[in-house]
Regions:
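Structured, charged N-terminal subsegments at the starts of enzyme catalytic cores
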Residues: 157-161, 166-186, 190
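Short acidic, low-complexity intrinsically disordered linear motifs used
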Residues: 56-59, 64
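Short, flexible active-site-proximal loops enriched in glycine and acidic residues
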Residues: 184-188, 200-208, 251
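N-terminal intrinsically disordered, low-complexity leader regions
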Residues: 27-50
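His/Asp/Glu-rich metal/cofactor-coordinating catalytic motifs and the adjacent surface-exposed loops
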Residues: 2-28, 47-49, 64-157, 161, ...
Length: 450
């Protein structure tokens, strides 16, 4: 098992020498000094959102020609929508007359109805959604049920219609948003697919996009974040999109490693730059972890994932060409690595370098905060209450090895007072606006696959 770095001066000296040999920079003036704000931010007082919002509301509204503003601020105050409408506007693609009636029948009061609805939606397997399959069949959808190897054979090896899986996934997303009874699942599929973004127009990813949406994102949407991290990292679509399929000892590529740390786990807010890893302070939430990540973490993370590639007839035997994940030992950099204060021994077993890093990330307190803050911003407010972020992150981290981690964390957020009392703090994106309008109209329609 990887071990946290000892504070022994000898160990630190050895590790500095190792980094120096690998990167040629330790001990030189090229390291950036760690910003003092990095240390101070951990203990900085949080802004009182309620006080700040009240202060903003007291500011006068300036009106005048061409400003687009009115001189009577009271006219901007909107009446709060009924509780059912508020909940359904956040947790589904939009409220309908039928969904409002169904929600109101779930309990004797708002609290009981919300709890029942959230628990129902967090168990999508118990909700009959078979009518969607009828719509897809009527629309001529032919790729949505193909396996990864079928997609590869039909749309990658045979390239006459290589974009069909991506096109059908995209069109099916709108059909599901409008007509699915598993509404919260569809909202979270959209959330995680944006989080672990793969461009639908990417020529290498398009032929297998159905697999990415169905078997990687959708299959893990209420499951475990650590499990989803590895599923994404081993997915054919992501391996191509972020170039890890060609990441090797002789030709390293840090694209996936950098996005893994910056977008998928820590967020740019926890990026420390090009600094000496031994100068990084511990995270105040748990001193066994560093407060953020550095460029050297990116470099050694890239090395850890060398050899993670695709059976595409190029990086191995030409007969191995079915589009599935494969680990190529000759491509792997088996040397020692230092990532997030964790020393990885040289010559570890196959896949272990990468899996150790996934474990380190999934259990990191700053990763928990980043992920929970992003979920809260999706459902509650773009300026969430820090106390909700902290409590959700505690739940997320306490359950990091629980197969239902994401379900448990999401339930905590959706039953919070911040969610219950929130309203009017979010705007819909264009896709969400179209889906909500179509649901409100209640018309029956379909989108053809071609």
């Amino acid at each position: 098992m990887p071990r946290p770095l000892s504070k022994s001066r000898n160990i630190r000296k050895i590790m500095l020498q190792m980094i120096s040999r690998r990167h040629g920079i330790v001990g030189s003036p090229h390291f950036q000094p760690l910003p003092q704000a990095t240390v101070e931010s951990a203990t900085a007082p949080q802004v009182d959102i309620a006080q700040e919002s009240a202060a903003v509301s007291r500011r006068p509204v300036m009106a005048g020609p061409g400003t687009g503003l009115i001189s009577q601020p009271d006219l901007l105050t909107l009446q709060r929508a009924p509780f059912a409408v508020r909940v359904l506007s956040h947790l589904t693609a939009g409220a309908t007359a039928a969904s409002i009636a169904e929600f109101n029948a779930l309990g004797a009061d708002d609290s009981a109805r919300l709890t029942a609805f959230v628990d129902q939606q967090l168990n999508p397997g118990a909700i009959d959604d078979s009518a969607l399959e009828t719509r897809f069949a009527a629309g001529g959808y032919t790729t949505l049920n193909k396996s990864l190897t079928q997609l590869w054979a039909d749309h990658r090896i045979i390239t006459t219609d290589s974009s069909a899986p991506a096109r059908e996934t995209q069109r099916a997303a709108l059909i599901r948003a409008v007509f699915s009874r598993r509404q919260l699942q569809e909202v979270m599929v959209d959330f995680w697919q944006n989080h672990f973004n793969v461009a639908i127009a990417n020529g290498n990813a398009a032929p297998v996009y159905v697999h990415y949406n169905r078997d990687v994102i959708r299959a893990n949407v209420f499951g475990n974040f650590r499990t989803m991290l590895e599923a994404v990292g081993q997915s054919t679509a992501m391996l191509y999109y972020l170039n890890n399929s060609s990441n090797s000892r002789s030709g390293p590529n840090e694209n996936y490693a950098r996005e893994l740390l910056e977008l998928h786990t820590f967020g740019a807010e926890n990026y420390l730059g090009f600094v000496n890893p031994f100068q990084v302070p511990p995270a105040p939430e748990d001193p066994a972890y560093p407060i953020g990540y550095t460029d050297l973490d990116v470099y050694d993370t890239a090395s850890a994932f060398t050899g993670w590639t695709v059976k595409d007839g190029r990086n191995g035997p030409s007969t191995e060409n079915d589009g599935t994940f494969v680990y190529r030992q000759p491509m792997h950099d088996a040397g020692p690595k230092l990532v997030l204060g964790m020393y990885l021994n040289p010559e570890q077993p196959a896949l272990k370098d990468g899996r150790d890093i996934y474990d380190r990330l999934a259990s990191h307190p700053r990763v928990a905060k980043f992920i929970c803050k992003k979920i809260i911003r999706r459902f509650v407010s773009d300026r969430p209450d820090p106390s909700l972020i902290d409590s959700a992150a505690a739940v997320f981290r306490a359950n990091w090895q629980n197969p239902d981690q994401l379900r448990i964390t999401l339930r905590h957020i959706l039953l919070s007072n911040a969610f219950i009392h929130g309203w009017g703090q979010k705007n819909r994106r264009p896709f969400e606006l179209i889906a909500a309008a179509m649901r409100a109209c209640g018309s029956d329609w379909n989108i053809k696959a071609v």
